[in-house]
């Protein structure tokens, strides 16, 4: 409920202003108020987010290229991030691609393509989830993923959960405000918020169903952090019939998801 209200309020204010986060506060504030400061904070938050988001997008692009050319024998997340030249190269490619895309009409071009790409990614994730359920370690992986262990909950876990919630809601960086500016005034904001929350949660649960059975099947460390997605998915595709092409499609869709 709190997530729904947080998203809904951001969309309401932004749709009313029809402007970027910085100008949104300036347009809605009354004389003598200084809400514009929060627009600057949102801008700083976006810059901080992009500082690592562009790097992660470069990692995704790297895996897409590796699967596309069929050179997946030397995959290894640790080796990849240890190569600064490789990381900087893919980072620059991502930045250039982002600037080029932003120079076009987003609603007329990128938005239309993204709708199809994200639908295809969702279908592919459903296929991969079903495939993961056939792994030898599926039962153990699902038990680890879905059966709660309340004894493991401590302050660190709570803080990590809150960090994830704030990240998903784009709290503090004007994310909801940006999305709200593109919502037509004929759309019901509460309904849109509910749909986004449900879809976001569904995709997150689906990702867990894909990843954790594979971890227990291939002996991967479930607490590996950012490398979990890349190492796990590479292992899944390497053991699938036609895995090279499944992997190519998956990381292609992920590239579009990250860029959008």
Residue ranges and their predicted role:
Residues 48-51, 55-62, 100, 124-127, ...:
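Alpha-helical transmembrane segments
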Residues 7, 44-54, 198-207:
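Membrane-embedded alpha-helical segments of transport systems
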Residues 2-13:
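Single conserved hydrophobic/aromatic residue that forms the stacking wall/gate
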Residues 8, 40-46, 91, 95, ...:
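Residues within membrane-spanning alpha-helices of integral membrane proteins
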Residues 111, 115-259:
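Membrane-embedded translocation segments of transport machinery
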Residues 21-44, 54-107, 136-160, 226-230:
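Inter-helical loop and helix-membrane interface segments of multi-pass membrane transporters/permeases
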Residues 14-19:
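Membrane-water interface of transmembrane alpha-helices
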């Amino acid at each position: 409920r709190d997530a729904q209200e947080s998203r809904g309020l951001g969309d309401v204010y932004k749709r009313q202003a029809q402007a970027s986060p910085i100008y949104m506060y300036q347009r809605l504030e009354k004389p003598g108020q200084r809400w514009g400061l929060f627009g600057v904070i949102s801008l700083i938050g976006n810059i901080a987010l992009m500082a690592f988001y562009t790097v992660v997008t470069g990692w995704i692009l790297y895996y897409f290229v590796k699967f596309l050319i069929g050179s997946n024998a030397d995959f290894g997340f640790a080796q990849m991030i240890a190569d600064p030249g490789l990381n900087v190269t893919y980072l620059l490619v991502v930045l250039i691609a982002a600037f080029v895309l932003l120079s076009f009409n987003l609603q007329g071009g990128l938005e239309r393509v993204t709708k199809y790409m994200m639908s295809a990614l969702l279908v592919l994730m459903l296929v991969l989830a079903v495939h993961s359920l056939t792994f030898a370690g599926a039962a153990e992986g699902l038990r680890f993923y879905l059966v709660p262990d309340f004894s493991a909950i401590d302050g660190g876990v709570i803080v990590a959960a809150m960090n994830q919630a704030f990240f998903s809601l784009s709290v503090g960086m004007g994310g909801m405000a940006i999305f709200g500016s593109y919502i037509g005034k004929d759309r019901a904001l509460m309904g849109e918020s509910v749909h986004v929350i449900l879809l976001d949660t569904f995709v997150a649960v689906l990702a867990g169903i894909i990843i954790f059975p594979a971890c227990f099947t291939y002996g991967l460390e479930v607490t590996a952090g950012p490398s979990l997605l890349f190492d796990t998915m590479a292992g899944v595709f390497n053991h699938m019939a036609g895995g090279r092409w499944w992997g190519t499609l998956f990381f292609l869709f992920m590239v579009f998801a990250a860029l959008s």
